[in-house]
Structure formats: structure tokens, C-alpha cells
Amino acid sequence: MSQSGPQTSALAESEARSRDYAVLCLLTVINVMNFVDRQLLASFANFIVPDLGLSNTQFGLLTGFAFIVFYSVMGLFMGTLADRLHRPRLLAFGLALWSGLTAASGAAKGFVTMLIPRMLVGVGESVATPTAMSMLADRFPSRQLGFAAGFYYMGVPIGVAASLPVSYTHLTLPTKVTVYV
């Protein structure tokens, strides 16, 4: 005998809630990765600065100003796009952009060749939070949105803390290539 009526409706609602929480967990993992990535350049400063012949000012620009300006300004633009475009595709674009340019920064030979990818990494990472917040608002009722946002933002301290063992693991590997962020 098949289920019908209230039982079927309750099962469908339960499955939908499970998907909502799975999306929340995935978005939180993306946020963790966002903050791990953001911290790694500073973690490798003792290797990158001499390797690229950077001054302290140049390195400060790479880890601060160049990234933050693009991240902050583009965050406003990406928030607008998140309200208008297909959010999962926009998030995938941001992830691909920041991941690809993080990898490309490993080929940097000096300040300018590291500066350009860092600016664009800021653009890619700026997609994550406004898009995630819009996706969460679509999936969670207003009475649960505070919990969902709090869970998502838990990724910030976890990502910062996780960057330390990640950088240590890379530093203990036998090849110089692993140092590139």
C-alpha cells in the first residue's frame, strides 16, 4: 500500500529540510576553504618574500590592500548579481575563479605577477558570502535564518584555525613547489 496524504507530505518536507541542511553544510565548508585560502599567503611569508624578492611593503599590499579592496568593492557587485542570477552557478564561478587564480599565483615571479592574481582572487572570493546568504534566505524561514547565518559564519574561525595545520603540512613536504599558495 502506498503512502498518501499527510504522511507523504511530512516525508517530502523532511527530505526538503535535509537538503536545506546539506546545502548549509556545503556552504559552510566553502566558507572554511575561503578563509583557509585567505590565510595561507601570510603563513608562507618567510618563503615567498625572499623567493620573489618582495619588500615588506609589497608583501603587505599583496596580503592586505590589493586583496581587500577588490574583495570589498566586488562584494557589493556580487551581492547584486546573487539577487539576479542563478546562485549555484554564480558560486561555482567564484570558486573556480579564486581556485584557479590561487593556483596561478604559484607561478608568480615577482610583485606584479603575484599582485594581479591576488586582486582577482579577491574578486572570486567576494562571490561566496553574498551568494551564500541569498541561498540560505531561499531555504530557511526567517525564524531560522539567524541559526543558518551563524552556522555559515562559523566557517570564519574554523578556516583561520585550519590554515595553520594546512600550511604546516605543506611546509613539511619535501619539495619547494608545495609552498606556493
Where do the PLM segments sit?
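Residue-level signature of mid-helix packing/kink "hotspots" within the transmembrane helices
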Residues: Q39, I68-L76, V160-A161
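Extracellular/periplasmic helix-loop-helix junction of adjacent transmembrane segments
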Residues: F44-S72
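Conserved MFS/SLC helix-loop-helix module at the cytosolic interface between two early adjacent transmembrane helices
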Residues: M74-A108
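Paired small-residue
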Residues: L101, V112-L120
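Conserved small/polar residues in nucleotide/adenosyl-binding loops
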Residues: T169-T175
